[in-house]
Amino acid sequence: MALGDIWSYPEPFPGIRIDRLETPGMPKGCVKGFTGALSVGSAAIVNDGNAERLELTWDTGKAPYLGLWLNRGHCGQHHVALEPTNAAPDSLRDAVEAWKQFATVEGGGTVRWSVAIRIS
């Protein structure tokens, strides 16, 4: 896996199923990826067994990217996270110099944005 690789969905790597939150063969594995700039700020985690869902919506004018963090035991933690963001990847240096995916704020300026969370 290299910086800037484009992942296939739902299986970016053999045996790693993002749609099923699986990292077989990596009992303490984790993976983080980012979208390119989105036109619609909406992402959801859906339980196909009972139709429960956790949905996030946000303004892509302020946070045009989405990070997906899937952790299956790294550092003793287990979680999945949907992370709207104004830069990709997490490292500001990489976002600016390598990926060229970032927003700027004028010195002394403020940017406000929000995320709506819906559980159903």
Feature roles, as predicted:
Residues 1-60:
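Active-site/ligand-binding surface loops and adjacent short beta/alpha elements
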Residues 5-7, 56, 67, 97, ...:
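Short, low-complexity intrinsically disordered segments
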Residues 25, 89-92, 112:
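A broad, structure-centric signal for solvent-exposed, well-ordered loop/edge residues
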Residues 43, 80, 113-115:
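Hydrophobic residues positioned within well-ordered beta-strands of beta-sheet architectures
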Residues 47-89:
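Glycine-rich active-site loops that engage anionic ligands at enzyme catalytic sites
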Residues 69-72, 101-106:
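Short proline/glycine-enriched turn/loop segments at secondary-structure junctions
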Residues 81-82, 87-104:
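A conserved acidic, glycine/proline-rich C-terminal tail/linker
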Residues 103-120:
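Short Pro-Gly-centered flexible turn/kink motifs
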